[in-house]
UniProtKB/Swiss-Prot annotation:
It comes from Mus musculus. InterPro entries: ADH-like_C (IPR013149), ADH_N_2 (IPR041694), GroES-like_sf (IPR011032), MDR_fam (IPR045010), NAD(P)-bd_dom_sf (IPR036291), PTGR2 (IPR037399). Monomer. This is Prostaglandin reductase 2. The keyword Oxidoreductase applies. Its main location: cytoplasm. Functions as 15-oxo-prostaglandin 13-reductase and acts on 15-keto-PGE1, 15-keto-PGE2, 15-keto-PGE1-alpha and 15-keto-PGE2-alpha with highest activity towards 15-keto-PGE2. Overexpression represses transcriptional activity of PPARG and inhibits adipocyte differentiation. It is an enzyme of class 1 (oxidoreductase).
Length: 351
């Protein structure tokens, strides 16, 4: 069977910005028969995420992410439907997901590496398993729970950078749900600021591209900052940390402003900012959601419940077609998305 797949065509270079041309689509032949334990799946939706920028380098700089190889298929979060199965626990018509889904229209996969999902958890919105009711949702929920030290009724202020992205848009809402009295988002357009305050319930939003970020933050956070959900790093984070209170907490989710730079992760803070962090006893620890697998199942159920109750609003930016994986990735890395960036590969989930 001839299918289409996306392979890594070139590397951006250690400090280069990724472009769509770093990827290419090619035809590929799948075996005609399945081995025991395998399933044939049709891909419905694929995810593009900031962490993938690290996988474009020869060395990812982390021990839990393997780099993509040139001329080899790229992979990431994906969801699809089983078309044929030689696996004991999976049957034709099952919906399955994986963190290592190949960027292909169809694939033959080891059934043990797939997780069966229940469409009822997302009211039929299968792509949500790649966002709010999937890894970004778990990253936001577990990150805030484990590293935010939020206690309801203690009048805490939370700031979220990259607030209109997949994790940021969820983290701010979760901050409110867990007890923060004030949540402020930082993003890069007025449209995104309005989205945060009018649709997601953020109390204020700061546009880092207009005006002085530190001044806007002082106005939005008169009592200082107690919890900082950091998606971006760099100058924005330095401005936030400078206004954090004593014994406050940084949830280090990502550093998208630094992913194209050849620096260690997490990047060290400038000496003046690091001095503030130490003086005020601000915690700043790397957070990796994969270290909390025991919390995944209850986390997914909690996220699904909030979504069904209308307490957790979900926003997606949807591209269409496998040929647009590179375009969608480049757009997401430059802030072109609101909410989770998804690529629809096949809309028809029926068999």
């Amino acid at each position: 069977m001839i299918i289409q797949r996306v392979v890594l065509n070139s590397r951006p270079g250690k400090n280069g910005n990724p472009v769509a041309e770093n990827f290419r689509v090619e035809e590929f032949s799948l075996p005609d028969a399945l081995n025991e334990g395998q399933v044939q799946v049709r891909t419905l939706y694929l995810s593009v995420d900031p962490y993938m920028r690290c996988k474009m380098n020869e060395d990812t700089g982390t021990d839990y992410l393997a780099p993509w190889q040139l001329a080899q298929v790229a992979d990431g979060g994906g969801i699809g439907v089983v078309e044929e199965s030689k696996h004991q626990k999976l049957t034709k018509g099952d919906f399955v997901t994986s963190f290592y889904w190949p960027w292909q229209t169809k694939a033959i996969l080891d059934g043990n590496g797939l997780e069966k999902v229940d469409p009822q958890l997302v009211d039929g919105h299968l792509s949500y398993f790649l966002g709010a009711i999937g890894m970004p949702g778990l990253t936001s929920l577990i990150g805030v729970q484990e590293k935010g030290h939020i206690s309801a009724g203690s009048n805490q202020t939370m700031v979220v950078s990259g607030a209109a992205g997949a994790c940021g848009s969820l983290a701010g809402q979760i901050g409110h749900l867990l007890g923060c009295s004030r949540v402020v988002g930082i993003c890069g357009t007025q449209e995104k600021c309005l989205f945060l305050t009018s649709e997601l319930g953020f109390d204020a939003a700061v546009n880092y591209k207009t005006g002085n970020v530190a001044e806007q933050l002082r106005e939005a956070c008169p009592g200082g900052v107690d919890v900082y959900f950091d998606n971006v790093g760099g100058d924005i984070s330095n401005a936030v940390i400078s206004q954090m209170n004593e014994n406050s907490h940084i949830i280090l989710c990502g550093q998208i402003s630094q992913y194209s730079n050849d620096v260690p992760y997490p990047p060290p803070l400038p000496p003046a900012v690091e001095a503030i962090r130490k003086e005020r006893n601000i915690t700043r620890e790397r957070f990796t959601v994969l270290n909390y697998k025991d919390k995944f199942e209850p986390g997914i159920l909690q996220l699904s419940q909030w979504f069904k109750e209308g307490k957790l609003k979900v926003k997606e930016t949807m591209a269409k077609g496998l040929e647009n994986m590179g375009v969608a990735f480049q757009s997401m890395m430059t802030g072109g998305n609101v909410g989770k960036q998804i690529v629809c590969i096949s809309e028809d989930s029926s068999l």
